[in-house]
Amino acid sequence: MKKKIAEYEVGEQVDVFLLIKTATKGIASNGKPFLTVILQDPSGDIEAKLWDVSPEVEKQYVAETIVKVAGDILNYKGRIQLRVKQIRVANENEVTDISDFVEKAPVKKEDMVEKITQYIFEMRNPNIQRLTRHLLNKHQNEFLDYPAATKNHHEFVSGLAYHVVSMLDLAKAISNLYPSLDKDLLYAGVILHDLGKVIELSGPISTTYTLEGNLLGHISIMVNEIGKAADELQIDAEEVLILQHIVLSHHGKAEWGSPKPPLVKEAEILHYIDNLDAKMNMMDRALGRTKPGEYTERVFALDNRSFYKPSFHN
């Protein structure tokens, strides 16, 4: 079986089929155009440069295009890149299914649905339970397919649901340690905090931002969705406002994207849980591609740090 892109080491030759995740045009110091492409398979992705591209070539190598690439792996300023020697668009008789090239959550969709449903079932506040169930049912298909982000953390098929399931387990453990927390509010906040991303993002493959995503963002989208759900369910209670606040404040600070800081206890805890799970996912994925006794490539979203994998961690 051929190696996946994440399994190649610096200096090794590559001759594989990959999917273009993104393609961004730039201008080199010599004034000539180039493309920065992110190429992916189920193991992860890698950056590559296509130099001196013509308008015709630029039109060929766009997102969601499967390509045959030959080249070698190099380390450029702490980041692993693929130096392209040959590239062409794959023929239809060679590969056909884009889904074969995308990374997916390590848990089955049906298992995640079952787990989230159980958390909703455990809720004792009828207003919170009805709102949460209504909104999840409304967006369930997209929720189970979409990534949690375009980059940095859980940026794979079903990443959004996987992020939520992990956060729910964290929320349960913390609630058991601190029984003064309102489990219903915390669980609902976990389930709903990023649900607006099914409107903010374009889909599970070659994910970009929609018009609503660029102009509104997932936080304000979800605050509005909660308000609409409350109207549809004829719920006129403070729980609606508190849930909206939890979603609104989950990034923690204005400079991180939240118009208000957390002002209820469950909102503060949700912010920490969200941050913890995102950072753990980034570190685990970077370390998963690293040999014991070596450093990861730089993780931009974690202050551009390289993390060391202890030599006794086999």
Curated annotation (Swiss-Prot):
One GO BP annotation of this record: rRNA 3'-end processing
Keywords associated with the record: DNA-binding, Exonuclease, Hydrolase, Nuclease
Domain HD: 163-279
EC number: 3.1.-.-
GO molecular function, one term: DNA binding
Family, similarity comment: Belongs to the YhaM family.
UniProt function note: Shows a 3'-5' exoribonuclease activity.
The protein, known as: 3'-5' exoribonuclease YhaM
